Amino acid sequence: MQLQFRSWMLAALTLLVVFLIFADISEIEEEIGNSGGRGTIRSAVNSLHSKSNRAEVVINGSSSPAVVDRSNESIKHNIQPASSKWRHNQTLSLRIRKQILKFLDAEKDISVLKGTLKPGDIIHYIFDRDSTMNVSQNLYELLPRTSPLKNKHFGTCAIVGNSGVLLNSGCGQEIDAHSFVIRCNLAPVQEYARDVGLKTDLVTMNPSVIQRAFEDLVNATWREKLLQRLHSLNGSILWIPAFMARGGKERVEWVNELILKHHVNVRTAYPSLRLLHAVRGYWLTNKVHIKRPTTGLLMYTLATRFCKQIYLYGFWPFPLDQNQNPVKYHYYDSLKYGYTSQASPHTMPLEFKALKSLHEQGALKLTVGQCDGAT
């Protein structure tokens, strides 16, 4: 009788956990829907659930959700100058790596591999799960056979965000000195080299970049501009989230076609279907209540797998710097701040608060001003 009672209790608890998980997923799907998406792919959710062991909280000490006052946040997020003492906390970094491995393995999840798909296979979009795409021949040709980061380990990694706080930072030389440099969304580097550096080992490319930065390739001039940018990568990893939303399908195919037609020397990677929700699951477990992780946070989470020390540059989601000077949203364009909108899928100030906490504990180095030696 006692055994039967325990069995019923276990079954009830299991149902409760499943209900709470799907309630959370429904909430994020509704939020994403407000910004143009529809939801998450079931297979990705199921895969995440199979690995989501609870991790030890090391980011937010409070058990309650972090609340961010957006009135004048840059004042509250002052970080010591680059020249001040910062020491890497190797113990904490290793603990975070082990925690993240309970949710995902960056070596595997960084890209779908050729052996797992074939031309014509049907894939449900992560944010438009009622919509599907067929794996094209071009996409299949560009899928890697093995992970581009298989057995890779680096002493120091730089992750370069795109905030205007990089302007006049003089961080280019310091960034280029790192073992592995990650950049976001094909951001231009040549004309900003003094502040952002030139070295690129991995660069992300959201499909929306083709619309925003290359005018949807409306003519030969814009196609040539994109082609030049791709050629400049010269063997780097080009990380394209191809399976997120239906709206990116044509743009991904355009880029794939250009790469193949012009024999561009890049190593393409297309993140796994479960990656985004696995990353979000890790941060939620650590009480960082993000809606959808930004590219920068995704890259940091992945980098913990293969980087001993991680240095962040250009992560600053506020319109004023620490001295109350105006800061451009991106260092290279005139895009406006949009994270305060209810429709925005991102919670950048909340992410920054978590990263700042990790900086203060020595798990990562966050540079938001001038670099050492900058003049």
Swiss-Prot record:
It comes from the Eukaryota. It catalyses: [N-acetyl-alpha-D-neuraminosyl-(2->8)](n) + CMP-N-acetyl-beta-neuraminate = [N-acetyl-alpha-D-neuraminosyl-(2->8)](n+1) + CMP + H(+). Changing N89Q: Loss of autopolysialylation. Loss of polysialylation activity. The chain crosses the membrane at residues 7-23. CMP-N-acetyl-beta-neuraminate binds at N162, N185, T294, T295, G296, W316, Y329, H330. Disulfide bonds join C157-C307, C171-C371. It comes from Homo sapiens (Human). The keyword Repeat does not apply. It is an enzyme of class 2 (transferase). Highly expressed in fetal brain, kidney and heart and to a much lesser extent in adult heart and thymus. One of its GO terms (cellular component) is Golgi apparatus. GO terms for molecular function: alpha-N-acetylneuraminate alpha-2,8-sialyltransferase activity; nucleotide binding; sialic acid binding. It is a single-pass type II membrane protein. Residues 1-6 are cytoplasmic. Glycans are attached at N60, N72, N89, N134, N219, N234. Autopolysialylated. Autopolysialylation is not a prerequisite for the polysialylation acitity, but enhances the polysialylation acitity. This is Alpha-2,8-sialyltransferase 8B. Pathway: Protein modification; protein glycosylation. Belongs to the glycosyltransferase 29 family. It holds the Pfam family Glyco_transf_29. Keywords: Cell membrane, Disulfide bond, Glycoprotein, Glycosyltransferase, Golgi apparatus, Membrane, Nucleotide-binding, Secreted, Signal-anchor, Transferase, Transmembrane, Transmembrane helix.
